[in-house]
């Protein structure tokens, strides 16, 4: 059971021509982003059957070059993820195009089996240069890499032909557009491009995410929008793929809810064949906050269905004021700054994990924490919600001001009905050096006993203020 989160599309922007001469395109049907059910293929770079994890360190130093950026890959095995099993890839790594450069911020990620060989690949950005495809293989990532000649970082099979496509945002014109790069060649070339959506000149495209919400074998697009002249505008819209285009489908809300300015995470909460949409929103300081029922942030689940959203179950905001949820709904808590979905107790339903990086613990301002909402057939409620922080028994470390524990969360899936592992980052740990904590799942959810933490030092480098763990995938 996998999760993915809509991040801003600023990670990768490259302008491209309308067509390109391509190398032979990859063929086959095993494309990671092509959904057969709500369960997305594992992120498994070496094909051993165990989920891997990456930490993208955009501000990492490489050979003395500041903010060159690197990706740390943590390989999974039968015991889960271990900090000891890692691989570091940067632009000085043999076979990776280019070379490490100051402020290039190599990283970001879009994992998918782009060449349909059964190994997960990784699409990364490299500053002002072209994106790079790191191909997976028996030895993992890094044995083969090419420059990607298209644009974007939302990888999916939008045409339903078994081939990976990449969606990107092109804001070079007055009216922005979303462009699909198709028929990707083994050398990173793009056989053809087409404009999938065009903005109206008022709306701006800010982020993209691919997922097969209606489970028809074609990936759909979740599009995050803003407005050119109005800060209190924007939200997330769902566009269902028809194979040759996209049809906008409204996301229905319940009375009193407000999904504008919300972030969205995709994952299976209720255990059926359709991915669900987990919305999180924090107060913005704008007029729309009047309609938003929270001081510190909220989470709502819109269940998926054959038409995109199962409208028979309307989403409801859950806050720290909801019965059963630990803590209090307070200004600055930043509930929902991060979110992930995964089956942490092995019952077939996905738990919803949301970060509370602004939570004050005692006198430690912004020490942070995470909330774990139990997944059910109807979604989530406040009942049986757990909170985890550095003051929780058996969790390494102590609550300190500015740790921002919960600034990023990620779920590493296990085998079917085997509890997944929860990864939580505290990007502000040790004066912004950052760190990551791993909590194994159990029949009662994530457990703190035996949990471990690690940071940049585990990679054999001198830690610096890189906010390690700020980007997990």
Where are each of the predicted segments found?
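A detector of repeated loop/turn-to-beta-strand junctions in beta-rich toroidal repeat architectures
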Residues: 66-70, 83, 121, 128-130, ...
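Acidic/hydrophobic-patterned starts of short beta strands in beta-sheet-rich repeat architectures
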Residues: 47-57, 116-125, 160-169, 215-224, ...
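Blade-edge motifs of beta-propeller repeat domains
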Residues: 2-38, 75-105, 133-154, 180-203, ...
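Hydrophobic strand positions within the blades of repeat-based beta-sheet folds
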Residues: 53-55, 71-74, 89, 106, ...
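Beta-propeller blade termini
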Residues: 36-50, 107-116, 150-160, 205-213, ...
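Short glycine/acidic-enriched loop and turn motifs that connect beta-strands
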Residues: 58-64, 128-130, 171-175, 226-231, ...
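Beta-strand-rich domains and repeat architectures in extracellular enzymes and scaffolds
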Residues: 35-74, 105-108
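Beta-propeller domains
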Residues: 200-210, 214-366, 373
């Amino acid at each position: 059971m996998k999760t993915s989160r809509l991040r801003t599309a600023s990670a990768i922007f490259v302008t491209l021509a309308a067509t390109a001469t391509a190398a032979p395109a990859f063929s086959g049907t095993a494309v990671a982003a092509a959904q057969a059910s709500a369960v997305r293929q594992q992120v498994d770079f070496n094909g051993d059957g165990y989920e891997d994890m990456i930490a993208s360190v955009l501000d990492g130093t490489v050979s003395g070059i500041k903010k060159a950026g690197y990706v740390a890959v943590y390989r999974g095995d039968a015991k889960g993820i271990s900090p000891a099993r890692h691989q570091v890839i940067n632009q000085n790594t043999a076979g990776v195009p280019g070379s490490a450069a100051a402020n290039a911020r190599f990283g970001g990620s879009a994992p998918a089996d782009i060449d349909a060989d059964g190994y997960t690949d990784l699409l990364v950005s490299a500053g002002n240069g072209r994106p790079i495809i790191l191909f997976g293989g028996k030895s993992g990532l890094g044995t083969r890499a090419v420059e990607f000649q298209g644009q974007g970082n939302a990888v999916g099979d939008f045409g339903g032909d078994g081939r990976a496509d990449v969606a990107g945002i092109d804001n070079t014109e007055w009216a922005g557009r979303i462009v699909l790069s198709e028929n990707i060649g083994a050398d990173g070339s793009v056989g053809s491009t087409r404009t999938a959506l065009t903005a109206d000149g008022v709306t701006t495209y800010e982020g993209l995410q691919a997922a097969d919400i209606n489970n028809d074998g074609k990936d759909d697009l979740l599009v995050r929008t803003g407005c050119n002249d109005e800060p209190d505008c924007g939200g997330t819209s769902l566009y269902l793929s028809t194979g040759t285009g996209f049809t906008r489908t409204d996301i229905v809300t319940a009375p009193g809810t407000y999904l504008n300015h919300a972030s969205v995470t995709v994952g299976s909460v209720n255990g059926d064949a359709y991915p669900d949409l987990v919305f999180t929103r924090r107060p913005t300081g704008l007029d729309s906050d009047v309609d938003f029922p929270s001081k510190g942030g909220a989470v709502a689940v819109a269940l998926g269905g054959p038409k995109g959203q199962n409208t028979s179950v309307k989403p409801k905001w859950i806050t720290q004021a909801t019965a059963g949820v630990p803590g209090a709904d307070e200004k600055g808590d930043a509930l929902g700054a991060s979110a992930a979905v995964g089956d942490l107790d092995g019952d077939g339903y996905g738990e919803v994990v949301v970060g509370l990086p602004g939570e004050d613990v005692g006198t430690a301002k912004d020490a942070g924490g995470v909330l774990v909402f139990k997944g059910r057939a109807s979604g989530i409620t406040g009942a049986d919600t757990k909170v985890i922080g550095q003051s929780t028994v058996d969790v390494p470390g102590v609550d300190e001001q500015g740790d921002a524990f919960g600034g990023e969360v990620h779920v590493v899936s296990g085998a079917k009905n085997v509890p997944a592992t929860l990864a939580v980052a505290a990007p502000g740990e040790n004066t912004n050096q950052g760190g990551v904590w791993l909590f194994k799942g159990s029949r009662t959810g994530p457990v703190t006993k035996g949990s471990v933490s690690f940071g940049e030092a585990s990679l054999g480098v001198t830690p610096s203020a890189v906010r390690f763990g700020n980007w997990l995938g």
